[in-house]
Amino acid sequence: MRNVVHRGGEFKLESPYGPTGDQPSAIKALTDGVLRGDRWQTLLGVTGSGKTFTVSNVIAQVNRPTLVLSHNKTLAAQLYGELKQFFPHNAVEYFISYYDFYQPEAYIPSLDKYIAKDLKINDEIERLRLRATSALLSGRNDVIVVSSVSCIYGLGSPEDWMAQIVELRQGMELDRDEFLQRLVALHYFRDDVDLSPGRFRVRGDVIDLVPGHEELALRIEFFGSEIDSIHTFDPKSGEIIGRDEYAFIYPARQFVADSEKLEVAMLAIENELAERLNALRAEEKLVEAQRLEERTRYDLEMMKELGYCSGIENYARHIAGRKPGERPWCLLDYFPEDFLVVVDESHVTLPQIRGMYGGDRSRKTVLVEHGFRLPSALDNRPLRFEEFEEMVPQVICVSATPSAHELMRSGGVVVEQLIRPTGLLDPQIEVHPVAGQIDHLLARIRERIAKGQKSLVLTLTKRMSEDLHAYFRKLGLRSQYLHSEIKSLERMQILRELRAGDIEVLVGVNLLREGLDLPEVALVAILDADKEGFLRDATSLMQIAGRAARNVEGLVLFYADKITDSMREVLDETERRRRIQREYNEKHGIEPRSIIKSVDQVLNTTSVADAEERYRRKRLGLQKRPELELRGVLDSMSRSDVMLMVAEMNAEMQKAAEQTDYEKAAYLRDEILMLQERIEQMTE
């Protein structure tokens, strides 16, 4: 890890409200722990208690560069938007996989089928990734990077990256042609028409370029072999924004290496190839040997001519000069030694990090054995979990249900945040016998419907959810079922109908990942709660029960003939939390109240389904200007809400393209472009 000298920059938290409830004590405990040098801490925060706000206060007080880890892109986008709002004057960056579509290279021996790597890079996300690494290498203190598990995958060496940075100063001696050669070496492309990130144009003694991580362009004017002036301007309008005394040009790609290192690497690749060919031929694997030689020599020729080749990351070990088995460089290496790591939803994120290495290793081993890659390709990999734990200096795990691993790492000490600003208590839990469960459940659901409230019912199998849904519909209830076989767009449409009031009961198997934090949900029923195992363990039961935690009348029903250890743990923990929450409310005269969302706020969260409906209407000729219909909803949305909408719609656009429904993909693309323009107009 690099030892970066901090060059200043203080975090400045901005919020219209201050810490309330047990947030002040949680902030103090976590801050004291960081300053004391505690390596691992755990924040147990119930749903709706403001965990992100608490973490933001800790970051501001310890004033250290921070990595915030999330287990999926959508939640990462949401966290990014929230933290941008809390820290508008600081560097809040975004680092996720930059692929809109990614099919990894693979080989299926049983079918003798090779699947070539296929991908589509999202230029905007690539720019944001470059901006994140640039901010970290600038040495500034006030940097927050929100990342998915992409942070444990291989990157170029930070030392190599820094060595390639070009510093420009007004009045410095610099040959124009030499500067152009440096730009090409940094993977900038000449394009006299489209001036976009990573491209430059030349007009006499004037060179315009857009750094790979920026949206604004630089204009460098030469007078002979001297830099006469440096200006920043808008590449779209051409408007000059300011005059600069100096500028730094960062590489336009994550993987860079100077020509000398590349020559050494190519020699090492040649040597490994010779050894591997001898081994394959000794095993009489002549087809594999021929295949490997042809592919590797082609890559070497491309590196010799262009300084780059497709799949160059598979040779990263040689380019970086690492030893066999040595871990790759990754985003963590770009942080200074004393950075802070916040793991959001740690009970899901940490197991995800643990599983990345095994899947990657299995796929690449097959490629190596059959002559598609050199053995060194195995070292282009994500970090092992043990390596990740060694690299993170201080960690705060955040979860409503921390697992045994977080508790063990934290020495059993947990910082609790159980008080909600709304005064809401954890929902009450009742246990009922299995005999007569459907009639009992039906009566409770009808009680909720009479109050305009929603119900969630969880079954153990998809078949059970469909049958129960059909039974409810037969009795006149507005019911729907939800499980993994339902397509993403249809799932979003179902959630939209639930939030808009068209559905009264939602039946499903695993409703944890759907983001069903709805204030209208006042009843959660769990069938077969005593079937210990997947989705009926203590963590899952607690997460499911939390779906009723945003309504003052929230109630959870466990249908079971016995109380399992997991059920007992959840019942005892819920009662403990309710007692603490009730005592706090009585002491401070707080009356619990349900969270209230306007119709616009409800519909914002299902924007993808709304876009599908507008697309359908457009095909029928019912609509010409989709932006007019969106405008009213957008006016009520925050910047982070719109960014989350774009992330969801990007995923649906890619799915439409994969299914060759290019008309739908183009329609979604147009809406995404409109939303991105709206984001630029909104305040940070």
Curated annotation (Swiss-Prot):
Residues involved in ATP binding: 45-52
GO cellular component, one term: cytoplasm
Domain Helicase ATP-binding: 32-420
Function according to Swiss-Prot or TrEMBL: The UvrABC repair system catalyzes the recognition and processing of DNA lesions. A damage recognition complex composed of 2 UvrA and 2 UvrB subunits scans DNA for abnormalities. Upon binding of the UvrA(2)B(2) complex to a putative damaged site, the DNA wraps around one UvrB monomer. DNA wrap is dependent on ATP binding by UvrB and probably causes local melting of the DNA helix, facilitating insertion of UvrB beta-hairpin between the DNA strands. Then UvrB probes one DNA strand for the presence of a lesion.
Domain observations: The beta-hairpin motif is involved in DNA binding.
UniProt subunit comment: Forms a heterotetramer with UvrA during the search for lesions. Interacts with UvrC in an incision complex.
Name used for this protein in its record: UvrABC system protein B
